[in-house]
Regions:
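Glycine-rich, basic loop-to-helix element that forms the pyrophosphate-binding segment
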Residues: 25-39
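Catalytic donor-sugar/metal-binding loop of nucleotide-sugar-dependent glycosyltransferases
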Residues: 110, 128-161
Length: 165
């Protein structure tokens, strides 16, 4: 598993199996992920905001994303990247979901998440590596979901979910 630790717009650490790797200078987070998929095409890629690294659920992390066609993330915020203020963004708009359980959704988060390199590689020519990592992740999931990629929000990525950044 490759871990990409970031501060919203900048990669600060990359590790593979707890061994540090060189950070690619002058690349934003999505560009870094695309580069990692070229170098490690058979690996899971985990991303995590630096504030939440101490709360990564290492005991369950390997059991959370078990398929090459799955993308999982979790946001500690009640608000998604795409605000409810813009109107209809999802078919389940009138259903109130609990953030305490795993749910299917294309709305991803940069707080923490993971996907197999195959997911990113398949969409590399479709989704451009923009600077806004949340936008990038939501674009990947929104395009990938109808193509058969399972997209989830899973609170078990973190061991402690009661705090706010």
């Amino acid at each position: 598993m490759i871990q990409v630790i970031h501060t919203n717009h900048t990669v600060i650490k990359i590790a593979k199996d707890n061994q540090s790797l060189a950070v690619f200078k002058n690349l934003n987070i999505p560009e870094t992920i695309y580069k990692l998929t070229e170098l490690y095409p058979t690996e899971l890629i985990l991303w995590c905001h630096t504030d939440w690294v101490p709360f990564i659920n290492h005991e369950q992390i390997n059991a959370i994303c078990t398929s090459n066609s799955e993308i999982v993330s979790y946001s500690i915020s009640e608000e998604n990247y795409l605000s409810k203020n813009i109107g209809f963004v999802e078919q389940s708009i009138f259903i109130k979901f609990s953030k305490k359980v795993k749910i299917a959704t294309w709305q991803m988060s940069s707080v923490i998440g993971m996907a197999h390199a195959d997911v990113f590689s398949a969409l590399k020519t479709t989704v451009k590596p923009v600077n806004d990592f949340d936008y990038f992740l939501n674009s990947i999931a929104k395009i990938a979901m109808p193509l058969g990629v399972f997209c989830y929000s899973n609170p078990n990525l973190l061991i402690e979910r009661n705090a706010e950044i």
